[in-house]
Structure formats: C-alpha cells, structure tokens
Amino acid sequence: MKSFNLLSLSLLLAIASAAAVPDVEGTITNDAATPVNNLDDKRDHCGQVCLNKTGCGGKCPKCDMRSLTCKKA
C-alpha cells in the first residue's frame, strides 16, 4: 500500500509540474480556440445569432430582430 501511495504521489507531481510549464518563446499557440476569436470569425457569416443591431457585420450586417439572426442588407 505504501508503494502505491508513493507511485500515485509521484504521478500526481509529474502531471502538476507538466501543467505548470510556461510558454517557450518561438512556439506557436492556438489562438483560434479563444471565444473572442471564434465570435470575430463568425461575424462574417449569415444566419448567426444576434441580440442587437451591432451584433452583425461583414457580408450580413443587418440583425433581423424577429428571428434574431444576421441577414444580408
């Protein structure tokens, strides 16, 4: 049982230390996974959900308040 506790503790420490590694200069980060970038990318598509007149842009700048979707002007 003692060896199991030691093994599980060392595994836990290995996972925690791997998660705490800072970003290394020169590596590529995946910014596309951030919600802000996803929203900016989707602003250009028709049919996205909008809640006000400023929620749409690009090819479909008009927000139809009945269906709450962006449509072409």
UniProtKB/Swiss-Prot annotation:
Alphabetical UniProt keywords: Disulfide bond, Knottin, Secreted, Signal
Protein name (database record): UPF0499 protein NFIA_054990
Compartments reported by the entry: Secreted
Protein origin, superkingdom: Eukaryota
Signal peptide start and end residues: 1-20
Organism the protein comes from: Neosartorya fischeri (strain ATCC 1020 / DSM 3700 / CBS 544.65 / FGSC A1164 / JCM 1740 / NRRL 181 / WB 181) (Aspergillus fischerianus)
Cysteines paired by S-S bonds: C46-C60, C50-C63, C56-C70
GO CC annotation, single: extracellular region
Free-text note on domains in this protein's UniProt record: The presence of a 'disulfide through disulfide knot' structurally defines this protein as a knottin.
Family: Belongs to the UPF0499 family.
Lineage: Eukaryota, Fungi, Dikarya, Ascomycota, Pezizomycotina
